[in-house]
Amino acid sequence: MKLIQRINLFVLVACCILASCTKNFTDTNTDPNRPKSITPGVLLSQMQYRFVNASIGSARNFGHELMQVTAPRASTSGGVHRYVVTASSNSGIWTSMYTLLADVQELYNTSGKLNEKNYQAIALIYKAWSYSILTDCYGDVPFSQAMQAAQGNLQPAFDPQKDIYIQLFKDLDSANKWLSTPRALRYGGDLVYKGNPDTQDSLVNMAKWRRFANSLKLRMLLRVSKRNGEVNVNEQITTILTNAATYPLFTGNADDAIFRYPGTNPFYNPYYNARQSDWQFDNCYTQFFINKMNGDNDPRRAVWSTTVDNGIYRGIQSGYTSEVVNIVGANSSYSDGLKTLPQLGIMMSYAELEFIKAELALKGFVTGSTPQAHYERGITASMAQWGAPMPSGYLSQTGVAYDAVATTERQLEQIMLQKYYAFFFTDMQAWFEKRRTGYPVLPRGAGIPAANQFPSRCPYPTYLQSLNPVNLGNAVKAIGGTDVSTVQGWWEK
């Protein structure tokens, strides 16, 4: 009987993930502790917390290993660091995002009934943020039919990545419009920007949501910039950059889209009680990641990393051969401080926006400053974000100083390398940008088989083969008939 119950529970959860089945639960499936009347504020706070837990989990468990931030201390075969990416390598992000997108839809619907456009705008921002991560990770994913459980659709079709992006741009435009007249969130619940009625400067804080919407759109437009002929990317970028009053962007670190863990129940940093064996001993920073920081005397090391041998920051190889043995405690890993650090819940930072502007300025867009000025602001902002005082002369030293007379490609490489470090714990953005630009250039470990290529996507979770076989099959056919990690997405080609 217990086995049958577990199987039934698995099927129920999986169906909820696939089709966001959140309505019409029977009484036996209703949480007795859940309020009968759900307000937008109750939905928002829990959703905000769980979203960043999922995103930073994907950073630590997948993105960091793939992008040579960390590598497993012990690995005799396979592994993401050797470019072996399977359906289970990152399936948690699919499960988490689709579960939480049901909450986004509920927030949108509930707010609509109450005519609370500001809550609806926030729901659209979370929708764009989460779906952009999903489609950048997998390619075509359920989108237009993903929220139709109430209509009986438990097997949603997969939408083309292009169509998803086009709709998300429209959603962000709607959010920007609805937030143009900021007012406090009547039902509270905002733990990101504190746009709550009982918060000082709530109207100022609500304006930050609008800046996030437009900054996120700029990120996404740059992501698909190779497809300018199919989507009017350059026109939309120019419109945002030249109309600050209509499309306000982040202006400083105070605008960072970060869920700052308060350190109180129930919103603890998800790693606050992680065992040392799981947090530090199983993974170490790589030589690629640490050696650059050592060479630059990067002050963020003290925030991010442990030391060994009386203050040394040391990394291990990534993609190493099977006979390599890394001794426990001999190399640097995540610092204990990160486990309780409030600012770990990153969605998008001001530092990232400055690096986006640096690249756009390099490509000829009018941003108001030079590529170098944006580059230096990006580095400075990242230091401030992590509470790492920047040493005097840091920006002018060899290895950091911007080379404005170098080739355009070399300048882009400089920008992207610093952006890579600024992406620390920002879901899988470093991977997405590596696929778009080719930077940073990662060394290929001696233990990576010659046949293994740097992945462009994650294969779909295996449980979809039984829960949504027809539409999964159609999605696989659309990418060439083989569900593997080397198939490039629409914006990457």
Label each region the model flagged.
Residues 390-392, 402:
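Short, surface-exposed acidic
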Residues 146-148, 261-266, 396-400, 436-441:
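Short alpha-helical linear motifs
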Residues 15-16, 137, 284, 458:
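Generic recognition of cysteine residues
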Residues 1-30:
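Bacterial Sec-dependent N-terminal signal peptides
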Residues 21, 198, 270-295, 301-305, ...:
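Long, intrinsically disordered, low-complexity segments
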